[in-house]
Amino acid sequence: MDSIPAMKIVARIQSEFPQKFGIPRQSGLVEELKAAIVFEPQYRIPQALRGLEGFSHIWLIWLFSEAVQSGWSPTVRPPRLGGNTRMGVFATRSPFRPNPIGLSAVRLDGVRQDEKLGPVLLVSGADLMDGTPILDIKPYLPFADSHPLASGGFAEQKRGVHLQVDFPPALLDRVPERHRRALIGVLAQDPRPSYHKDPQRIYGMAFAGLEVKFCVRGSVLTVLQVLRS
C-alpha cells in the first residue's frame, strides 16, 4: 500500500501561546497550563466522546503546522544536547519529520458543553501553540501506556534544570492571577533556545495576551517587563 487516506483535522487547540517561543518542550512539564480543544463543526457530536470522561489523561495526535513547509532532515540537533550534537530524527521528537506529526499526553480536566462550539475538552499540561490542528484523540491507558522501567536514552542523561524565577511583585501584579502559576512554570523551564547563553540578551515571550521580557544570568531568570501585547 503506497498511499494512505488523507488525514482529517478533527479539532484545534486554544492555548495561551500565539507563537512557538516559550512553549514547553514536552507535554506535562507545566501542569498549570490550561487549554481547550474545540472540535471542527462536523465532529461536534457528543456521542463521539461517550465514555471519555472516565479517563484522567488523553493522547493528542496533532500536526506540526508551523513545520509543514520546512521539509525534513535525517539528523537534527536536540535541545537536550545543547543544540550542538546531531541525532537521528527518529530518535528525537523534532518537528522536522517526514510526516510532521506530534504526540502529547495531557490531563483531561473535563468536558464543557458550549452552545455554539458543542463539546469542548478542557485539558492541562499541553505543549501546543494556539490553533494547532488535532488529528486524533485517544484515551491514555495506564496499564498499557505507562512503563516505569523504560530507558530515556540521551534525553534521560540530560535532564532539564529548572531556573529560579525572580518575578518582581509589581510586574507579577500585571499578570491575571489565573495565569501566574502557569507563567512562572513556563519561565522556570528556560524558554531560551539551548544555544543562547548570553547573560546580556533580553528575550520576549508572548503569553496569554502579554509580552513578557526577561534575561537569564546563571540559574536565575529575571522578569524585566510585562506588557499588554
Please provide the spans of the model-predicted regions:
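Conserved positions in beta-strands of structured domains
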Residues: 14, 106-109
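Mixed-charge, low-complexity intrinsically disordered regions
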Residues: 1-101, 113-122, 126-229
